[in-house]
Amino acid sequence: MPKVIAHIAASASFFALVLLLSVPHAWGQTSAGSVSAVNGTVSVERAGKSTPAADGTAVQVGDKFTTGPNSRLTIKLSDGSQLELNESSTLVLTQDTLNPDGSRANTKVTLLGGLVRSLVHFNPAGAPNFEVHTPNAVASARGTMFDVSYHEGQPPPANP
């Protein structure tokens, strides 16, 4: 009887490993891109620990970036899209998934304050879903450049 239980446990472990390895590449993705430029004071908070951001820093889902006054940050995502965070801004990368061919499937960021410029890479094989969330709105784009700003307690700017 103990040999049967050991055999069942070994088989279950093997099938669990096969299942984990068969999950699409996007699940196992460890880096969504990297920091390509830092000007001034910029921090990245990961797993509750804040450190200064530097050129080449890997960007992961859940990372929270904060720029100080007169500071800027540029993040290059793995598909070539770019995020440019303006001074006194805070941004969280909340989702980043890729298609099996490595093209972007879904990216979501949350702008908690300040301004972000998004340069979204166009993929002719299938446009990615790229969203910028703020506490009161969502902007979505596929293959374009756009700015989103959010300043708590301030009315949105008037359209010209």
Per-region residue spans from a language model:
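Intrinsic disorder/low-complexity signal
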Residues: 8-11, 62
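Flexible, surface-exposed loop/linker segments and immediately adjacent secondary-structure boundaries
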Residues: 28-160
